């Protein structure tokens, strides 16, 4: 029941409420500017309002964008609730190709950049392989999970694919033949994300059971389990050198809602935590080395904020509030100064990281 004008009224049906919420979010995005925290050269952090409106391109998805990944220096691949994957040139604002084949929402994307190919996972329990230069129909279908597929990771040599699901299992596939070659299952291990360690046979995996696991792809055996966290681990990312990984946590009201840096070498200890979001942190990435003197990471969360952190100290260097976008679902690195951020209500945001005077994070386009 709802209290309106001092009287109890019947609550809105769920579908109507969801549509109303989406409309309110989109309206809010047109009425409010994005705000961000600017880190000045003298170390002072101040809040600013972005006065220059971002370029608004025609949205490539008609519903929530669940995942974004970069295929090469110009193209990104996005997937969402509209069941399609889209190849998009984020530098020119032009859609390159739409891929249709899944029966339900796309949950994950994993790219093979050198081959211009990618995999998509879905709530329809399948994984499809696509070729940018080929047909708009899938090149290959991998079926083996009993529930929604929630993890995808391609091996460094692109010969193997690891998939994970809410069915508690991980499957290892031969990309060339499309055959499942290994299977592993752990009770209550509801997979949320997978990431292959560069130049290594290891796979990092996050789970709803609040743990981060390290798997050896040689036989698909669990090699290590990091200390259990207090909240669901939603995502993970491995550094380019393979020495560290980040995981991020669910939460609400600032409880949980953090990202954590882990050592993947001998000690495998927790190295740093990044706290400042107020809702579930859905994605985390290492930023490429830049003119900045410090290594940095970025996070996006359901509180509509993207944050940049000093990787070594845990200090928040910049915060961008994407008002009206709703929960932010996925982050991807475009290039040394660009981030791509997927959202519930406003598609994909192109963000610019500017180091010319201090540190600024601003939205420059949406599609």
UniProtKB/Swiss-Prot annotation:
Cross-referenced InterPro entries: G-protein_beta_WD-40_rep, WD40/YVTN_repeat-like_dom_sf, WD40_repeat_CS, WD40_repeat_dom_sf, WD40_rpt, WDR31
One Pfam family in the UniProt entry: WD40
UniProt cross-references to CDD domains, sorted A to Z: WD40
Keyword Transmembrane helix attributed: no
Entry superkingdom: Eukaryota
UniProt keyword list: Repeat, WD repeat
SUPFAM superfamilies from the UniProt entry: WD40 repeat-like
TM regions (residue ranges): none
WD repeat start-end pairs: 60-100, 101-140, 144-183, 186-225, 276-319
Protein name from the UniProt record: WD repeat-containing protein 31
Species of the source: Mus musculus
Primary gene name: Wdr31
């Amino acid at each position: 029941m709802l209290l309106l004008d001092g009287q109890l009224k019947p609550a809105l049906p769920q579908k109507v409420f969801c549509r109303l919420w989406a409309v309110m979010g989109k309206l809010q995005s047109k009425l409010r500017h994005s705000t961000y925290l600017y880190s000045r050269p003298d170390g002072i952090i101040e809040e600013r309002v972005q006065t220059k409106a971002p370029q608004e391109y025609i949205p490539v998805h008609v519903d929530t964008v669940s995942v974004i990944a970069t295929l090469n220096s110009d193209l990104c691949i996005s997937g969402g609730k509209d069941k399609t994957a889209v190849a998009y040139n984020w530098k020119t604002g032009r859609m390159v190709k739409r891929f249709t084949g899944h029966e339900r929402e796309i949950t994950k994307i994993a790219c093979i950049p050198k081959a211009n190919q990618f995999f998509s996972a879905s709530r329809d329990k399948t994984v499809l392989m696509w070729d940018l230069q080929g047909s708009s129909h899938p090149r290959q279908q991998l079926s083996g999970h009993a529930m929604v597929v929630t993890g995808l990771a391609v091996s460094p040599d692109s010969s193997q694919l690891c998939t994970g699901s809410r069915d508690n299992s991980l499957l290892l596939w031969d990309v060339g033949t499309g055959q499942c070659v290994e299977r592993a299952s752990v009770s209550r291990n509801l997979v949320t994300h997978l990431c292959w360690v560069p130049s290594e046979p290891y796979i990092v995996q996050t789970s709803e059971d609040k743990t981060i696991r390290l798997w050896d792809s040689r036989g698909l055996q669990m090699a290590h389990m990091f200390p259990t966290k207090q909240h669901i681990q939603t995502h993970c990312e491995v550094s380019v050198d393979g020495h560290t990984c980040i995981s991020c946590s669910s939460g609400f009201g600032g409880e949980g809602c953090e990202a954590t840096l882990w050592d993947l070498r001998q000690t495998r200890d927790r190295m740093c935590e990044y706290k400042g979001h107020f809702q579930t942190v859905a994605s985390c990435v290492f930023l490429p080395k830049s003119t900045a003197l410090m290594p940095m990471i970025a996070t996006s969360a359901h509180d509509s904020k993207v944050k940049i952190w000093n990787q070594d100290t845990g200090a928040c260097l910049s915060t961008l509030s994407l008002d009206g976008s709703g929960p932010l679902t996925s982050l991807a690195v475009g290039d040394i100064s660009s981030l791509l951020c997927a959202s519930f209500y406003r598609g994909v945001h192109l963000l610019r990281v500017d180091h010319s005077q201090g540190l600024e994070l601003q939205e420059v386009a949406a599609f």
